[in-house]
Amino acid sequence: MNIAVAQSGGPTAAINSSLCGVFDEAEKYNEIDRIYGSLNGIEGILNDNLIDLKEVLITENDKQLLKRTPSTVLGSCRFKLKNSSDDDSDYKRITQNFAKHNIKAFFYIGGNDSMDTVMKLDAYFRENHIDIKVVGVPKTIDNDLPLTDHTPGFGSAAKYVATTLQEIIRDSRVYSIPSVTIVEIMGRDAGWLTASSCVLRANGEPAPHLIYLPESDFSEEHYLEDVKRISERYKAVIVAVSEGIDCLASRSEATDAFGHKYLSGVGKYLEELTRDHIGCKVRSIELNVMQRCGSHIASLTDLDEAWRIGAAAVNEALKYGGSGVMMGFRRISNNPYRVGIAPLDLSLIHISEPTRLDV
């Protein structure tokens, strides 16, 4: 028998570590002949665009390099499977290609939308009595997947955000003139990444002085009042803002295949608003894609956990017969920090709202 693995959605510093975990654990099973990598997510399965990972991951050095390489080495996609009840043509193509290569288990590394694909494929296989296991491996820097304690990729992105904010804060203080620096951080529905900037306060750093999250109502009037109030105490005001806050700049009607709005420009919008109403020196900084794949500052814990959860997915399918589940973290203790890994019911994840901060 053979297995296949694919990556989907936005890249991270840790997603290839999960791929390495799948590969390493699958190699331990004598019954597995080939470990296929699907190029560009589920599209690679549909188009029969597969590579044999055993032909490229030959030495231990190859695998260690993969574990520490950012982005998605197999490529990604944002392809949305239709409901099989409406159109099952893609499901039939996937089934045919799995049969062609004797693939009996499929592992999909991704976020909310990838888990939607896992659930749909598993349901189709069950309804048609097809013995193929499908297991999801979580990935998202937004940290908004329900039920799991956190997601691989978030730790490294949060570390990048906090470190970059610390450097911006130091840069902003060199001049005597008043200034406002607005840093736009990713997070469409949840503000975990933006909130991670406040870890600097644990060491007595007051900045960022203002933090705005999509979980809270946003008022331009209150924002301007906040900036004026803080500027009376600090000459260099630092604002951390999530791209998903509800302001004029975020109300685009353009969406992707999954119905998600394209977000951009919140920082620039607030820069112009601040300049028009307050008049001090203002600049906005959009961290954009840089926060996703900052391997130079990746979290070792994040990389290790990403590997572990990829390996656990293989055991869930091949050792325990699990399918239609996503592997997730469960917090065991905070001090010392310990987490366990367990399968989570994808139907519960699918009907749940994104995990958001309680503010």
Model features per residue range: what roles?
Residues N97, A105-G110, D116-D131, T151-R283:
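Accessory alpha-helical/coil subdomains and C-terminal extensions
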Residues T12-V22, I45-L46, D90-K92, N112-K120, ...:
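Short glycine/serine/threonine-rich phosphate/pyrophosphate-binding segments
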Residues D48-K104, D113-S114, I141, P152-F154, ...:
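Glycine-rich oxoanion-binding loops at beta->alpha junctions
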Residues H350-V359:
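Single conserved hydrophobic/aromatic residue that forms the stacking wall/gate
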Residues S8-G10, S38-G44, R78-F79, G111-N112, ...:
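Short, ordered loop/turn segments at secondary-structure junctions
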Residues N2-T12, T72-R78, K104-G110, G136, ...:
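Short glycine-rich or small-residue beta-strand-to-loop segments that form or flank ligand, phosphate
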Residues M1-L50:
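N-terminal phosphate-binding or glycine-rich loops at protein starts, especially the Walker A/P-loop
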Residues D256-L270, R275-G328:
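C-terminal catalytic subdomain
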